[in-house]
Swiss-Prot record:
Subunit note: Component of the ribosomal small subunit (SSU) processome composed of at least 40 protein subunits and snoRNA U3.
UniProt entry tagged with the keyword Membrane: no
Provenance organism: Paracoccidioides brasiliensis (strain Pb18)
Gene Ontology MF: a single term: U3 snoRNA binding
InterPro entries named among the record's database cross-references: P-loop_NTPase (IPR027417), UTP25 (IPR010678), UTP25_C (IPR053939), UTP25_NTPase-like (IPR053940)
Region (Disordered): 1-173
Basic residues biased stretches: 18-30
Name this protein carries in UniProt: U3 small nucleolar RNA-associated protein 25
Keyword field: Nucleus, Ribonucleoprotein, Ribosome biogenesis, rRNA processing
């Protein structure tokens, strides 16, 4: 199973894809191992700890106790004490689950001080010795039903009854429109249009020099509507519990957020390609607020309908309010520290009175920043600061007053994970233990820092999306009489909302937008207008920046055409500048920047074996090069022993080296990240005495029309058109 080109090379699925750090599980935790997958045991072992068998709904016993106007069932396991009005099949499932629990280890009873406003609780089970980051971290010990009932005994019932006051169903609520009051005929028409790629689009401008493209299924009688801006959280349809706290932490929206929030909270898909250090926290708070709002509304709808069914056991009510499994929100993140930041947003917005296993979470997910990185760029410190391990997963379960970390996936409301962490539990190497049913009912999928995921192994992200909203292989205690019709009709992927945030957009991210974001409510893409990275070069003297276009008939043929152009045109001039008379080598100081690892291997092998380059001395640094070999290559290049140095984009992404001795730069392809252009060109000025000479050597970059997206970020939106279509010449220079 090969990874995408240039994103880790041809590697097995469980390899990080050449990731340059986190080799020991990131700072702050040991490397996780996966010998005891409790998710996998859900299908094979029949353990009482599975947690996937529900009493005819997505919610378990603890949640049922929180239903308004609903009498609390007994904590006894004796079937004689069961509620007489329950359905026989559901009662049987409860008895079966209780029988299993009876044979398991004794559960520890907890006592909580309900007079305390906030309590952090550590619940240790028989597997707590595995807390150092095993697979069980995302499917950890659950509290027993007896404990959950004990927790609720002292809760005033008037609190339960009034919790949802003011939260009555609103026909104008996007939640009701998108999930509950669904016109099956219109839904089918929209799905048919999407399946035939029948989208109608509208383009407009957004504040901050952003471009908005809104798309909706092209159905008869429906046109695209530009949604009015939303000024603040007071204008959102929030649960009262969230509305009470959101205003304290989310200030009045700026002009950009005001324009995008209506689409986010209106359950439309969003691809936002202008994520920055300054707006990342705001959008993180917004998508966490949206996810919490969705979880609470889903949960309360199920509880209210449970109450109705208990009050009217003989009625023919058809209350379809849930999916096949409980998890409703999936948040995909690049590192454990990014997960910590998301949890900080969730807790400040939800304001739980208790947080179970919070200390364990911080011990295994959080770490201090490396002091040696103080000189690193801000974007580097944001991504790799703290615990930068990229293999993790975490289940979150919400009750009325509690957030439970490390809940079993099938008992969780929200799953936070890295693509690699999810894939390790979804698809075992032996192929015998596969489990992705917990993704069958995801209704909101969020991808943050998608550009960072590209530098890990994008194939893992594609794999996760390919397994979202599939029909489950097992029932997991599902009450099919409560499952929404569009789940049963295998239409869930057309109802799911996907929110993707990235610093820039690439063909891979565009492919995700085109093929996986198929929301019947519509989708929008927000992209910046670029001035060009060539205007922001950190050198005291002007630098000649030359772009050479080569012909390429298709993306498939582009690598071959690029290599042919390099060896026939660029390399010949490189050899002339790197060798003296008679072929004797001389110091050149030429850095060849290569975005793709596969291209790096091809060029390295060519330079080492071709008769054309027999007198050319070179070194090579890739994301797989050892620290010792990196130091040797840098030393030889700086001293002039090597006249050429090969350097990959992913190496720069993970390490941000400052390469000294650079006098001229050849870009085999321009970088995806526009920040890298200025940083790499800045190598020319690391030796002040030779800055003028290096500026004269300048930069030469190769490109084709298939590089349009990243070329736009480098040369600017206005310049790009002529450079791609100019017929009078294929070389463009800027000073």
């Amino acid at each position: 199973m090969a990874a995408g080109r240039g994103r880790g090379g041809s590697t097995p699925f469980n390899v990080r894809g050449g990731r340059g750090r986190g080799q020991k599980g990131g700072r702050g935790s040991r490397r996780p191992t996966f010998e005891a997958s409790r998710v996998a045991e859900a299908h094979h072992g029949g353990s009482s700890e599975d947690g996937s068998v529900h009493s005819g709904s997505d919610l378990d016993a603890e949640d049922q106790l929180e239903a308004p106007d609903e009498s609390s069932p007994s904590s006894s396991d004796d079937e004689e004490d069961e509620n007489k009005t329950e359905k026989p099949y559901n009662t049987l499932l409860q008895l079966f689950n209780a029988g299993q629990d009876a044979g398991g280890p004794a559960r520890k009873r907890r006592k909580m001080d309900h007079n305390s406003k906030k309590v952090d609780v550590e619940v240790k089970g028989s597997d707590e010795s595995d807390a150092e980051g095993l697979l069980l971290e995302s499917e950890g010990e659950e509290s027993s039903e007896g404990e959950e009932m004990e927790d609720m005994e002292d809760m005033p019932m008037d609190e339960v009854r009034t919790e949802n006051s003011g939260d009555e169903n609103d026909a104008s609520d996007p939640f009701e429109i998108h999930f509950s009051n669904v016109d099956s005929t219109l839904l089918s028409q929209k799905i048919e249009a999407i399946s035939s790629k029948g989208w109608q689009s509208h383009k407009s401008e957004l504040p901050g020099k952003l471009r908005l493209m809104a798309s909706q299924p092209n159905t008869e009688g429906h046109t695209i509507q530009v949604l009015p801006a939303t000024q603040g959280v007071d204008n959102l349809k929030l649960k009262q519990k969230l509305a009470n706290h959101a205003g304290d932490h989310i200030s009045k929206f700026d002009s950009l957020a005001s324009s995008l929030v209506p689409y986010m909270f209106g359950y439309q898909d969003l691809l936002f390609g202008a994520r920055t250090l300054s707006n990342s926290a705001m959008f993180r708070d917004l998508y966490c607020l949206h996810a919490l709002n969705h979880i609470l509304k889903t949960r309360d709808r199920v509880l209210k309908n449970n109450s109705r069914l208990q009050k009217e056991p003989e009625s023919d009510l058809e209350l379809r309010d849930q999916g096949f499994t409980r998890p409703k929100v999936l948040i995909i993140l690049p590192t454990r520290q990014a997960c910590v930041r998301v949890m900080e947003s969730i807790t400040k917005l939800y304001q739980p009175e208790q947080q179970e296993n919070k200390a364990r979470f911080h011990e295994t997910f959080s770490a201090a920043d490396d002091k040696l990185w103080e000189h690193k760029p801000d974007d580097f410190r944001e991504l790799f600061g703290g615990n930068d391990d990229d293999m993790f997963r975490l289940g979150l379960k919400f009750t009325r007053k509690t957030i439970k970390y490390f809940s079993q996936f099938y008992n969780s409301d929200i799953i936070l994970a890295s693509p690699l962490g999810l894939r390790m539990v979804m698809d075992k190497e032996d192929g015998k233990k596969q489990d992705f049913d917990f993704l069958s009912s995801i209704e909101i999928a969020i991808v943050d820092q998608a550009d960072a995921l590209l530098m890990q192994n994008w194939e893992h992200t594609e794999y996760v999306f390919a397994h979202l909203n599939l029909q489950p292989k097992e029932s997991h205690g599902c009450d099919f009489s409560r499952v929404r019709n569009w789940y049963l009709d295998d239409q869930a992927k057309y109802v799911r909302q996907t929110l993707t945030f990235s610093s820039f957009i690439t063909p891979e991210i565009n492919a995700l937008f085109s093929s996986r974001m198929q929301n019947t409510a519509g989708k929008i893409k927000a992209t910046p207008t670029y001035e060009g990275a060539i205007l922001d070069i950190p050198l005291p003297v002007p630098v000649k920046q030359t772009f050479s276009r080569f012909n390429s008939s298709s993306p498939v043929k582009d690598p071959e055409n690029r290599f042919k152009y390099f060896t026939s045109t660029v390399l010949s001039s490189l050899i002339r500048s790197s060798t003296g008379r008679g072929g004797t080598p001389r110091a050149s100081g030429t850095l060849i920047f290569i975005p793709s690892y596969l291209d790096f291997v091809r060029i390295r092998n060519y330079l080492a074996t071709s008769s054309q380059t027999e007198h050319l001395s070179f070194g090579a640094i890739s994301e797989y090069t050892s620290v010792r070999d990196v130091a040797r290559a840098r030393t030889h290049f700086f001293s002039g022993r090597h006249s050429v140095l090969l350097y990959t984009e992913r190496t720069h992404h993970f390490r941000r080296y400052h390469i000294r001795g650079v006098k001229r730069i050849i870009m085999y392809g321009v970088p995806e990240n526009p920040v890298f252009w200025g940083e790499v060109v800045g190598f020319l000025g690391l030796d002040p005495a030779g800055t003028a000479e290096a500026a004269e050597g300048g930069v030469r970059a190769m490109f084709s029309k298939w590089d349009a997206l990243k070329m736009e970020r480098i040369v600017g939106t206005k310049r790009l058109g002529n450079m791609l279509t100019e017929k009078g010449g294929a070389t463009f220079s800027f000073v």
